[in-house]
Amino acid sequence: MASTPPTAARRSVAGYASPLAQPTPYTPPAPVAPSPAESLPALPVPTRKGRTISLWLFGVLGFLLIALVGYFVWALGSFASVVGLVLALIPLTIVFLGVRLIDRWEPEPKRLVAFAIAWGAVAAVGLTLLVDTALTLLLGIRSEEFGAVVQAPVVEELWKGLGVFLIFLLARRAFDGPVDGIVYGALVGAGFAFTENIQYFGVSLIEGGGEQLTVTFVVRGLLSPFAHAMFTAITGFAIGMVARRHGSARAAAGAGALGLVGAILLHALWNGSATFADFFGLYFTLQVPLFIGFILGIVALRREEARLTRARLEDYAAAGWFTPQEVTMLATPGGRKVGLAWASQLRGDRRPLMRAFIKDATELASVRQRAITGRDPMAVNDERALLIRTRATRAALLAY
């Protein structure tokens, strides 16, 4: 790494605010890397403020969980509830692993992942049950067709979407763009489907025994495990588009409302295909193409996310923090594989260090993007800590 910044480092990088900022129109480049001869400072832990969910919210969800467990035991009995629970874990695992693939480039904080699943599985389901019961008692709505095609899409997507919006409000520094929105939305939807499947599987076992349970499990657990995840991911995508630009709560609410309309319509279309038409016919002509389109959209967004990571790391390379070769290694899937393979051949197998280097560099790129868009006043602190961490990790990787 050069001891003095290259010429490119002296040039302005538009739109970036840092501790070195001066009155406009001057806008400074990324902080210039110090000389490698300087001693490395102690490795700090990046600040977590604004990146997680308060513990009291988990306490509320825990209370609701106890109430929900009591409801299932009362309505289905212990045996049917346990059978439904075990079977419902299978599609939940399928969806969770799929979401992890989407989220592999820049993984979301574990506590937010847990909150998203818990909100869908506990809060959204509980609130949906309350609204459904109230509508039945107050308005006398008992039509299965109306419930499936109108009531369920509106009520369920509203409460699921609220969970995604809460994550944006309470941890917006971990909500960087549409991919994050899709991840959080899909996790909320997966949690909701998990609890809903417990009920469906339990009722099928009680009413039709093993034969009906098998049919229900195949249809809900194997043929369409991603349905709820896709619906709520639309809401998350809309909120994420706003999060990438400026992060205004009002703008996110407006975009979330538009995404919610899309989620409701897709949910209604999905339920309608099962209620009014030949399920298997429409499954292959409608639902499978929708799922394929969803996957292609995610692939395109992932590529855009990687391109943005590379662009931001190139800003730091221009200031001397990374070499061009390191940027290629850190900001491309192939480069990461090569880097991990190289680290495995070093003394003591240093793949954990390489993973930490990749993780911190990716987070650094996200921090810079938030700073450029002016939506994170804490970006300077995170940037400073992450730059120190990446230097220290590189030094550990190259140490003999």
Feature-to-residue mapping (PLM):
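Hydrophobic alpha-helical segments at protein termini of multi-pass membrane proteins
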Residues: 1-400
